Amino acid sequence: FLPYMTNWTLTDAVSPACVKGSKAANLPQLERSCLGWMVDDRVYVQRLGVVVLMSLLSTESFSPEHLQAVAALAGSDEYYVRVAVAWYFAEALTRQERAALPWFALADSSGTTGSPGLPAVTLRMAVTKAIESRRVPDGLKAELRQIRSTLPRSPQRCRKNK
């Protein structure tokens, strides 16, 4: 089905049934697939990997390494990949707050991905999505607004590359 992933509506509609109930034994395979899709050359296959990995946030298969893998795509030139990364981190904040919160910082400008942080454009999108969420407590929203106020405004924040 990967060749048919040609736009964001298709990738966002995928909802793996193996995340629920007795099919949870399939989660390790799903995790491996997602991580593989995220390094694919195709934009919407990368997005699919991020979106489906999001479904593992509330399962025993969640790993902090998933945050690192998704963050590796945060500097993508592809708008739809960056939006998926922002969405993932906003969702991670609601389901895995302790693991996700350190990533709500500006990435080291040296380009190293060893320490938590996201590029400004992606971080601004993630913060905005989290602030707009009804599942994020008001106190945390105030912290996020403070983070957003320190971020540089970028003319490319609304630009779509394809």
Give the positions of each predicted feature.
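Alpha-helical scaffold domains
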Residues: 1-162
